[in-house]
């Protein structure tokens, strides 16, 4: 099973995990690292490293960050030297739900691709969806 570590500004990681588990049920091998404005960056880097070690079952680990280029993302990227670690920036709930569903039976690269696609697919303007009947070109106008 692919491990997941959410690394975000503020408490967002904890709230996203709670929302994901509300949708798909309790998840194993998931950890969160919340980065506050006054946190010591090296302490948070160590926290990320420990979380990777804790959730890694040998199938890889995805570090999910809130915004590419931000401190959480930069810290996560610094962990990519480690084999089997991927970073996916711009985390949202559809991305997490998809990753939770595929991480037991897909290899790391395929799981990341599925999660990224789901994250993009469900970004939508309600007025556009209601007028066109399409959710980002899917034609079904429906959810996941």
Question: Where on the chain are the PLM-derived regions?
Answer:
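N-terminal loops that bind phosphate or other acidic moieties
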Residues: 1-144
């Amino acid at each position: 099973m692919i491990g997941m570590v959410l690394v975000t500004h503020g408490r967002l990681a904890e709230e996203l995990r709670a929302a994901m588990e509300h949708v798909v049920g309790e998840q194993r091998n998931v950890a969160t690292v919340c980065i506050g404005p006054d946190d010591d960056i090296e302490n948070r880097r160590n926290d990320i490293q420990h979380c990777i070690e804790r959730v890694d079952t040998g199938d890889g680990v995805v570090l999910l960050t809130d915004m590419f280029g931000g401190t959480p993302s930069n810290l996560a990227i610094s962990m990519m030297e480690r084999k089997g670690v991927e970073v996916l920036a711009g985390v949202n709930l559809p991305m997490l739900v998809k990753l939770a569903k595929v991480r037991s039976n897909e290899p790391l690269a395929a799981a990341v691709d599925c999660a990224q696609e789901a994250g993009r697919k469900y970004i939508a303007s309600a007025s556009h969806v209601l007028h066109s009947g399409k959710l980002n070109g899917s034609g079904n106008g429906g959810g996941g």
